[in-house]
Amino acid sequence: EKDKLINIEKLLEKRVIGQQDAIEKVSKAIKISKAGLQDPDKPLGSFLFLGPTGVGKTELSKALAEYVFDNEKQMLRLDMSEYMEKHSVSKLIGSPPGYVGYDDGGKLTDSVRRRPYQVILFDEIEKAHPDVFNILLQILDDGRLTDSKGKIVNFKNTLIIMTSNIGSQIPIDDNFDYTTKKNLALEELKNHFRLEFLNRIDDIILFNKLSKENISAILNNQIQLIEKRVSSKGISIGFTDEAFKYLKEKGFDPLFGARPLKRLLQDEVLNPLSEVILDIGENIEDKLIFSKDKYGLVIANKNLRVLRS
């Protein structure tokens, strides 16, 4: 664990591409906390991740769960579009006595009671009802929360992360430094959030838009993950330069970050690959090559016999 924390910045950079500034700031805050220099009555850290869709906000949250808590599944994701109504607060802390769902408990409080060491991700926080922010203020202030049954839940070993794309539409010159960009975003945030809320967050972290070079690196990472999955079946896969270039070009969209690339890999790599594996079964060749023809990607065996086009 000690080595993980010392090298957390390098580990995060391998997994989350193109966000060096964000990773540096989060890593420093994590080290302060794990060294015991953070306020002991507050969560380990609290961050507001700002940036457009598909640039790595959720991926960094998962990576923090893995490197800080040893498992990326040590994360509770709460979609704030499901907490837009006043009554939805009861889903977080449980329904009041006498109401339907009282015995079920709250999704947030029950999760932290069962797993006190985890990342809690409030996704698209700007969509939450104001009463949700009152709950967040309690967590950020006191590191604890009282559920509907009057039981106190300790949040002092959690990482609180909120995401938003507020400010991502502001026309910002790429030559601006990080501080200038952050100040512009902060002015926009003040139009949406109360100052008492913003002031309680440890840091507001800006995420960059992804470049073509970033997409190329992300594609490499995704291919390695696919290779790892299929290797368990005794199969190896490869991509020609033309196939890699095709995926990189078609998967790049500056508006939606890496999301189009992941959908493309699902449609043009995983779906046809699964058909080949299911069709051929145990007789499958040990090496499959993805190449490019005029219609798209083609899967061939090591002797270049086409298996799927």
Located regions from the model:
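AAA+ P-loop NTPase nucleotide-binding core of proteostasis motors
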Residues: 1-309
